[in-house]
């Protein structure tokens, strides 16, 4: 699954369509961040709602059953917001990376049990701590540095 996230520049629809076609050829799902309306218009596989987006306007949109909505959260309030936004799964961070949103292993585990939504672990996952994910309630993990 590929999520296109670029908050610094205006969205280039032609580029999004190129990436969509590439993902389709390779058998990958392609989601657009923070723009559900455009994801629907361009017939993408879904959309990603970042933690700072509290909007529920998309609940009135007509979506196909296959349309995926993912969201991210760093605390219980944001998790509740993602549930109100009716996301299919929640990226919860940060499990290992010590940043401003650092949860740590035990707080992450506790928060992951406070929702019925599938949880995807995020933040500082490496070859060294990958096995620890078997000890928590998560569907899987995501990252950038892990795959570099």
Question: What annotation goes with each model-predicted range?
Answer:
Residues 61-64, 82-84, 109-115, 133-136, ...:
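Alpha-helix C-terminal capping segments
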Residues 1-63:
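N-terminal active-site wall of soluble small-molecule enzyme domains
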Residues 12-17, 83, 102-105, 131:
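Conserved strand-to-helix beginnings and helix N-cap segments that scaffold or border functional pockets
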Residues 29-36, 50-52, 70-79, 117-128, ...:
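Glycine-rich beta-to-alpha transition loops that act as phosphate-gripper elements at the mouths
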Residues 41-51, 67-113:
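Glycine/Thr-rich beta-alpha phosphate-binding loop at enzyme active sites
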Residues 1-3, 29-31, 45-48, 66-70, ...:
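Structural preference for beta-strand elements that scaffold enzyme active sites
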Residues 49-59, 89-104, 125-148:
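Glycine-rich phosphate-binding active-site loops on the catalytic face of alpha/beta enzymes
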